[in-house]
Amino acid sequence: MKKTTIFFTLIICILSFTTISAQAKFEKEKTEIGIMLDGFNVAAAKADFNTYFNYFAEESTFIGTDATEVWDKKAFMNWAKPYFDKNKTWNFTSLKRNIYFSKDGKIAWFDELLDTQMKICRGSGVVEKINGQWKVKQYVLSVTVPNDVVDKVVEIKAPIEDILIQKMKQ
């Protein structure tokens, strides 16, 4: 009986340690991703083109606030280059960030509320650990709209987006 109790106590201790160790690993990874995303935002604010785009994986996608803005890395670089060259980039600061992991810990996804020149926006995306570094695979920037003013926003954007909707349906 004593041996059985000791055996099960030992098993419980090992399982507890494994769970705590996995949680600690993800906390370390969350910190790394948070630092990476903050650096990503600072590089844009400083108009540091090379540093900013180095945060993206070679095969990555940027999805902007306009319905037509879906770019691979090269296309996004081409679009953004004039803004970086003229020092007319964006300055985003994270207000609240959530980070989640795949079971194997190689992929993470995040959502965050950002303080921007457009007021509160939402950044979300997928990051992958590539050669020991977290890289952005997909980034989505969305303008948040308070529910109380959605009808007014829809009224303003309807003439523009009705045309786009018709083009996309063809």
List PLM regions with ranges.
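Hydrophobic pocket/interface hotspot
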Residues: F40, Y52-F53, S60, F76, ...
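Short, low-complexity N-terminal intrinsically disordered segments enriched in polar/charged residues
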Residues: T19-N54, E58, N147-V150, V154-Q170
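Short beta-strand edge/turn micro-motifs at domain boundaries
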Residues: R122-V150
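Bacterial Sec-dependent N-terminal signal peptides
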Residues: M1-F26
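A short gly/proline-enriched turn/hairpin at secondary-structure junctions
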Residues: T61-W71, P82-T89
